[in-house]
Amino acid sequence: MEYYVVHQLNGEVTGRNRPFAALTVEPEDTLDLLVAGDSESYNSVSTMRLWDDKGITTYDCGQGAQRIPETYYMLKHAFKKQSPKIVILETNTLFRDIGAVKSTQEILTQAGQYYLPVFRYHNLWKTVVDEPEMHTNYKGFVIRDEVDPYEGKPDYMKKKKKCETMPEYVKVYLEKIEELCEKNNAQLLLVSMPSPKNWNHKRHAEIQKYADGKGITYLDLNKKVEELGLNWTEDTQDK
C-alpha cells in the first residue's frame, strides 16, 4: 500500500519527505551509490554527471539540515530495495547538536515514521485518486547557478591543536550506520565537501581520528581545493 500511494503521489511529496518517497519508487537494485547528508551533499554531488562520465547510478538522499537519525532511517529505507556498493556520508551533519531533549524526540519521530510510514505521508492520502503534476527529478541533486563568492581567509583549514567533538548521540547513530552498511555489503565513505562556511581543521581532525579508529575511508576535499581547481569567486555560494 505504501508503494502504491507514494508511486501515485511522488510528484506531490515535497520538503523533508521527498527523498523517502523518491527512493520508494526507484526500480529495485538499480543504484550503485547512495549519498546522504545535509545540503552539502545534494548541492555537491552531481548524479547526472556521475552517470554521464562514469556510468554510475546514484541517488542523493540528502535533506536540508539533515539530522543523523534521519540519515540512518533514510539509508535503512533505501536498503529495502537497493544494493549500493558505496554509501557516501557528507560529514557536516555529524556536528549538528540539537540537544538531549530534541535528539530524543527526533529519534522517536524517525523510528515511528519508518515503522509506520502512514505518519510520514498522512497529508497526502486524501489525494490518492488525483493525477498530480510530476516534477523533474535529478535523483536528489539540486541544480543551482547562483554565485555568492567566499571572500574570507583562504587558510580556513589552518591546523589547530584541538578537535571539535561530535555529539554523543551522533556517534551512536554513526556506528549504527556503519553496521547497516556492513550488513548490506556496502562500503561507507566519509566525505567533507569544500565549505569554508561549515568546515575547519578542528572538525577535520575529529573525523580523521574517528575514521582512523574505525578503519573507515575519509576524504576531506577541503584539503584538495587547489587540486580540484575550485574558484571561490565563481564556483560557490559560501559567503
Where are these regions (language model features)?
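Loop/turn elements at helix/coil->beta-strand transitions in domains of secreted/extracellular proteins
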Residues: 30-31, 56-57, 83-86, 182-189, ...
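Catalytic His-Asp segment of secreted/periplasmic serine-dependent ester chemistry enzymes
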Residues: 204-239
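Membrane-embedded segments
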Residues: 36, 40-117
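Secreted/periplasmic serine-hydrolase-like ester/acetyl group-modifying domain
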Residues: 100-186
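Residue-level signal for short, function-critical loop segments
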Residues: 39, 194-196
